[in-house]
Amino acid sequence: MEQTELESKLLALLTQPMRMDEMRRALPETGKNELKNALDHLIADGQVMKNKKNRFAVCTHYGCVAGTYLATERAFAFVAPDAPTDGAKPDDLFIPPGANGGAWHGDRVLVKLSERKNNRGRREGTVIRVLRRADRELTGALVQRGNAYFVQPASKKYPEVAIDCHHLGDAQP
């Protein structure tokens, strides 16, 4: 993501949670709509979060990190965190079974870090939000179970997808 000057200022400012009015006082030359648009962009990109008290801060303040979801053919996955500005590549995060938050391979996600590490010493996390979906073209076999239809993806990195019988067209299992 190309950051604007305002977004860079906000990231430097939001190391501690702040309300919108506090940000406006700290950046008096910035219009309300301009500030809101920059904040919305940073939130959508997984760099800033808003807490329940309507305070904004960088995601790391809340123990979260954004990255790319990397599914495996088994039930667990990894997230490759975004590289920080200092260039050091952070270790991948382990996502245990059931903690994928509906993410699929290649999605950009926001992960809440856990304090514990897995048995290999990797940090664990839970996907709390899918920020951006990866491409959704999927190749697989159509299967029928009773009255239900599913596509079994060719790659086990993807889950089965339920298909409404009205959307089958001419496809047959």
Question: How would you label these PLM feature ranges?
Answer:
Residues M1-P173:
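Charge-lined substrate channels and their catalytic hotspots, especially those that engage the 3′ end
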